[in-house]
């Protein structure tokens, strides 16, 4: 009799997990449930699957509300009905129009009203009025009793008990942003919205058997056939499966000849073998759609990187989906697709951050808005945010909330309500709070997506489904990962800047040629990789130096072992040790030497686990991948795992291996599989790193300008500006006659973009550039103020940063002139149209001189950093006993160094103490790294940006010098002479 059950996907309303509802219902003797979250369809299949597991009949519905007002409950009679309900919710979300007060005509649904939009006698055959149990006694005096065929039991389920009711009320307050004392009864559920013992509702409504019968009729006449199947995905690209295979074969074979030459037997055999598996598993359309997306991107000049396990496929390489040669790197196709793999294949396609939306728009237009949507993610209540939300709802002052957040164990300091916060915070922890957009997952369906979910329009203009990637996997949808990154943006922009600044058209797509360039390899080996994608961090630069990395294969390995899991396991250090001392280890078995020789016997990659399992024990590659996947997940107790484990040891015994050897190899497989990384993924990143390195090597100024303009790198803008200077650029502050909105370059001079002036309005910055491009340079401050509508305050920002230095006047003289020429009431026009313009009266100024360092202090205030050498601002002339380039000459010695703070990394030791790895630059601009162990860090902590004098011992780690800090002190700047 329960036709209105809510889960916590009735956001900030429900309190049940979807799986709990059928489990609890079963305990109450209920055999059918209608699952109807409020304006949400996230957990529909989750609920259906849970019901089937419990032997409960699942029925799907949606409770439609507008601005918290209950409009009607829609119940799907079948899958077509579910599509109708999802479509109704979708149309409202996409159009932005409110839901209709009266439900539209629906052919396959039941509609239940609480507040009738028309006379009961006008209700359609499938429309009813819902009567709550507590309203039964009022029926005898209501005209509704005359229409018994139009009444049903309406007993919502929202929580399990009174604690659940209280949690519900707190959720409602969070939703409405009010304190608990202001919560109105109409804004929350009634305390009676719980499951009742079997027979309770029938007893309440026993005087009205028609109502019971009507309700049972609805339950009996509804069913759902929702199933998980790969057929939900778009099945063909061309419209016919056979034509898909023909097209894919044609593209793959011609691509193979283009990539490898006409007579590369091994490449062609692998291509044909992969095509056979792709066809058998029904993935032709998946490959062709991915190819189509990449083809479109290339047609409009966008760069891309294909990565993930998809780069294990030679067909993907032949189709230009990836630029990783699987033959060169011995990559196994079975890591990507094999008949034993239950999860769908996965291509990760990266585009520049400023191109991705256009590619996404193409996909929606090409494959249809009813069939295309982005995946959702669930932002959940968690951690400190729960305490803050509940603290506000309970009316606690911010100071009391801060105390609870900062000192959760200090019970004696807590507000008395803290115990309620912890109690109910634990109850709502991990409840979804709101839906947002997945990083890049896109679904393309065969039937309209509304058969499974409603769609919700997001601020970016694209709709999302209501479920996340795990919900998609449960339904066996294949997602297309269309992702964005800044690295591709700076590569593309650098190519454009080289063309613009030097008139050279360069090709960065011939990665094979770039990988063999001796100058690029030397740049890699030096570790001078600031700005280069994935390899610019202090840790990575140090690793490259330690490994003397100068080729693609070693960079692929370095990109893997730098990851936290490998480093923390100790295998990164073992890898470096074996690289430097090849005689210090022996291979466990000849198979290790044959197949892990390039990584010195260390299982760096997921593919390495597959290789050892396959070549050592004889499990086929499909089984090896299944075993690898189980070991990296949480299914080590599964039947499949035990079967493969038993087969591994049986095969080893048949091959005559000693038991001790078999067990040790198994132990290593188990331990390595937990942190190993996809080799194809690393290879894709390494290829992009080489493109960045090529540009940094041959066109460093254009490259660094592009890095500055794409933001989001490892370092701050200040550091990239510094690196550009180190590469030979002359750095100029923003200028109204030379700067554009973004940073630009003329020859070897880089002008900081107007975007970097923190206080300058974006609209004004664009107007300054556009006016100059149309009518030419500004001729004077007066000319500028007559052509640009600018406030006095904004004009002062420009004067202070030096944007009018070309006038020959200093900032004080310009400030005086500003008072004479700035008039906010004038009509702002190009000076050539001002026929009767008059010059301001001549006046004599006193000598207005700038102090020595005030420009630097203005730059710090307005840009966030000085454009001069920050060491010039120090009170002391001391620059350290040694500089960065001298550190190797002072190994083991205690020295003083003076450095300008660049960044630091927090690390927790095995004992739980905090330590830092720091990076600084010396007076000459060269990097040096510092190590701050817990005692040192506790006594001498970093105090923000600026220069520090550090005392410590110079140590060496595989040829990479750093300073173990014992003492540190921040050095004061000279005083700003104006204050």
What is the role of each PLM region?
Residues 36-38, 60-64, 76, 153-157, ...:
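Glycine-rich, histidine-containing beta strand-loop boundary motifs that form or position
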Residues 41-42, 65-68, 158-161, 311-313, ...:
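Short gly/pro/ser/thr-enriched loop/turn and capping motifs at secondary-structure boundaries
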Residues 11, 64-77, 157-178, 343, ...:
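Short alpha-helix plus adjacent loop in nuclease-associated cores
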Residues 1-35, 39-54, 87-169, 203-210, ...:
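Domain-core and long-helix interface of multi-subunit machines
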Residues 4, 37, 58, 78, ...:
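Divalent metal-coordination and catalytic microenvironments
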Residues 57-62, 159-164, 172-218, 335-376, ...:
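Phosphate/diphosphate-binding loops
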Residues 32-35, 51, 191-192, 242-979:
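Noncatalytic, beta-rich nucleic-acid-contacting surfaces in large DNA/RNA-processing enzymes
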Residues 203-246, 511-513:
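A short helix-loop
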């Amino acid at each position: 009799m329960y036709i209105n059950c809510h889960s916590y996907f009735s956001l900030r309303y429900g309190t049940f997990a979807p799986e709990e509802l059928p489990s609890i219902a079963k305990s109450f003797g209920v055999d059918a449930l209608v699952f109807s979250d409020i304006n949400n369809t996230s957990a529909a299949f989750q609920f259906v699957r849970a019901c089937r597991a419990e032997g409960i009949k699942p029925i799907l519905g949606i409770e439609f509300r507008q601005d918290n007002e209950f409009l009607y409950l829609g119940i799907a009679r079948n899958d077509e009905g579910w599509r109708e309900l999802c479509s109704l919710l979708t149309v409202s979300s996409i159009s932005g129009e409110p839901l209709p007060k009266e439900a539209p005509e629906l052919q396959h649904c039941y509609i239940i009203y609480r507040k009738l939009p028309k006379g009961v006698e006008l209700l359609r055959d499938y429309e009813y009025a819902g009567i709550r149990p507590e309203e039964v006694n009022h029926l005898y005096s209501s005209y509704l009793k005359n229409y018994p065929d139009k009444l049903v039991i309406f007993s919502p389920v929202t929580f399990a008990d009174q604690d659940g009711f209280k949690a519900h009320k707190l959720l409602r307050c969070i939703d409405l942003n009010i304190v608990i004392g202001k919560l109105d009864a109409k804004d929350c559920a009634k305390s009676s919205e719980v499951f009742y013992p079997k027979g309770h509702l029938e007893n309440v409504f026993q005087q009205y058997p028609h109502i019971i019968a009507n309700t049972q009729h609805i339950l009996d006449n509804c069913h759902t056939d929702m199933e998980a199947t790969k057929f939900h995905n778009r099945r063909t690209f061309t419209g016919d499966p056979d034509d898909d295979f023909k097209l894919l074969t044609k593209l793959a074979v011609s691509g193979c000849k283009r990539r490898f030459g006409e007579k590369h037997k091994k490449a062609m055999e692998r291509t044909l073998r992969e095509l056979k598996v792709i066809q058998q598993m029904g993935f032709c359309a998946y490959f062709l759609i991915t190819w189509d997306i990449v083809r479109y991107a290339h047609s409009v000049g966008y760069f891309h990187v294909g990565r993930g396990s998809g780069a294990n496929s030679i067909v993907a390489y032949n189709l230009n989906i990836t630029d990783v040669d699987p033959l060169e790197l011995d990559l196994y196709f079975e890591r990507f697709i094999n008949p034993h793999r239950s999860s769908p294949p996965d291509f990760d396609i990266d585009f520049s951050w400023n191109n991705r939306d256009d590619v996404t728009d193409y996909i929606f237009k090409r494959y249809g808005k009813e069939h295309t949507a982005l995946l959702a993610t669930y932002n959940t209540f968690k951690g400190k945010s729960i305490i803050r939300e509940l603290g506000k709802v309970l009316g606690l002052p911010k100071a009391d909330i801060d105390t609870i957040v900062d000192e959760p164990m200090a019970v004696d300091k807590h507000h008395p309500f803290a115990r309620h916060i912890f109690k109910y915070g634990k109850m709502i922890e991990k409840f979804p709070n709101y839906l947002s957009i997945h990083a890049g997952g896109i679904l393309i369906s065969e039937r309209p997506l509304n058969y499974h979910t409603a769609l919700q329009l997001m601020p970016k203009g694209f709709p999302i489904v209501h479920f996340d990637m795990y919900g998609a996997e449960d339904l066996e949808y294949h997602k297309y990962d269309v992702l964005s990154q800044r690295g591709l943006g700076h590569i593309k922009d650098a190519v454009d800047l080289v063309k613009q600044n030097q008139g050279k058209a360069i090709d960065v797509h011939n990665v094979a040629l770039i990988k063999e360039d001796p100058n690029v390899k030397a740049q890699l080996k030096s570790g001078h990789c600031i700005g280069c994608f994935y390899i610019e961090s202090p840790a990575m630069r140090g690793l490259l130096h330690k490994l003397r990395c100068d080729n693609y294969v070693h960079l692929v390995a370095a990109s893997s072992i730098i990851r936290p899991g490998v480093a923390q396991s100790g295998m990164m250090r073992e890898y470096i040790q074996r690289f430097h001392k090849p005689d210090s280890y022996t291979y466990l078995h000849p198979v290790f030497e044959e197949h892990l020789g390039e990584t010195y016997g260390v299982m760096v990659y997921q593919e390495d686990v597959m290789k050892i399992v396959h070549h050592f024990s004889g499990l086929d590659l499909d089984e090896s991948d299944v075993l690898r996947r189980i070991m990296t997940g949480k299914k080590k107790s599964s039947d499949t795992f035990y079967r493969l484990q038993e087969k591994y040891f049986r095969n080893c015994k048949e091959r005559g291996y000693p038991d001790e050897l078999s067990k040790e190899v198994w132990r290593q497989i188990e331990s390595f599989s937990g942190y190993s990384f996809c080799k194809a993924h690393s290879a894709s990143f390494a290829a992009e790193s080489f493109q960045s390195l090529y540009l940094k090597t041959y066109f460093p100024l254009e490259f660094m300008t592009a890095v500055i303009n794409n933001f989001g790198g490892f370092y701050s803008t200040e550091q990239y500006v510094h690196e550009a200077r180190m590469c030979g650029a002359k750095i100029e502050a923003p200028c109204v006659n030379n700067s554009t909105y973004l940073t630009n370059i003329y020859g070897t001079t880089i002008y900081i973009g107007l975007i970097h002036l923190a206080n300058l309005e974006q609209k004004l910055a664009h107007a300054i550039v556009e006016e100059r491009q149309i009518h030419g340079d500004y001729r004077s401050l007066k000319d500028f103020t007559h052509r640009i509508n600018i406030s006095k305050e904004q004009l002062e920002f420009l004067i202070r940063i030096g944007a009018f230095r070309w006038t020959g006047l200093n900032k004080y003289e310009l400030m005086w002139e500003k008072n004479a020429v700035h008039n906010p009431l004038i009509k702002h026009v190009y000076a050539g149209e001002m026929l009767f313009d008059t010059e301001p009266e001549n006046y004599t100024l006193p000598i207005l001189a700038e102090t020595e360092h005030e420009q630097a202090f203005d730059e710090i205030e307005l840009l966030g950093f000085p454009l001069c050498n920050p060491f010039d601002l120090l009170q002391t002339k001391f620059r350290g006993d040694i500089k960065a380039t001298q550190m190797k000459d002072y190994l083991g010695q205690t020295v003083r160094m003076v450095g300008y703070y660049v960044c630091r990394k927090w690390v927790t030791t095995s004992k739980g103490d905090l330590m830092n790895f720091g990076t600084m630059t010396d007076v000459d601009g060269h990097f040096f790294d510092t190590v701050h162990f817990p005692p040192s860090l506790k006594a001498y902590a970093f105090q923000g940006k600026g220069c520090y004098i550090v005392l410590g011992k110079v140590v060496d780690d595989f040829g990479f010098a750093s300073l173990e800090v014992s003492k540190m002190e921040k050095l004061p700047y000279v005083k700003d002479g104006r204050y």
